[in-house]
């Protein structure tokens, strides 16, 4: 009798759940790091000039099936209220910005947040970097409000433009006065990208 009751309970359980989830996908498997060929963590600060400004994050390099290159930069940053230099991300000419998402300053209104990222494109053919994304930088060299935030930058290789086997991405931070001259980029790091399409 006990065995029969157990079998009946198991059968009822199976019947109930098989009908409950019938036709549905109960398990989802996200593909992790699909196409990623390089990962570069970074950290840079302006403490050397007495500013509490820093940026940390990761650069992800993706090789697409068509041979193109996708680069995503995810960064957490904090900018000193006395720092007019902010943070700048510099890219070579074969990359174009697809998406720029920022929460800096995270305690600001949506209008304030939208007003802080700036993208500059140089026409100088001799310059190593062509595109500059600046967060919290005042080109009038006036102290900003400072604050914290997160930044997501997505860049794509320009169609029909050759992708070098290796190229740099630059990140600078801080603005200060040196010998009477205002200097943008108190500290600067270069991230070497050695892009290679994977089979």
Describe the role of every protein-language-model region.
Residues 2-13:
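Hydrophobic membrane-insertion alpha-helices, especially the h-region
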Residues 11-25:
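Hydrophobic single-pass membrane-insertion segments
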Residues 41, 47, 94-135, 191-193:
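A surface/secretory-pathway sequence property marking extracellular, secreted
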Residues 75-79, 91-95, 157-159, 173-177, ...:
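Beta-strand elements of well-folded, non-transmembrane domains
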Residues 126-181:
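Low-complexity, intrinsically disordered segments enriched in Ser/Thr together with acidic residues
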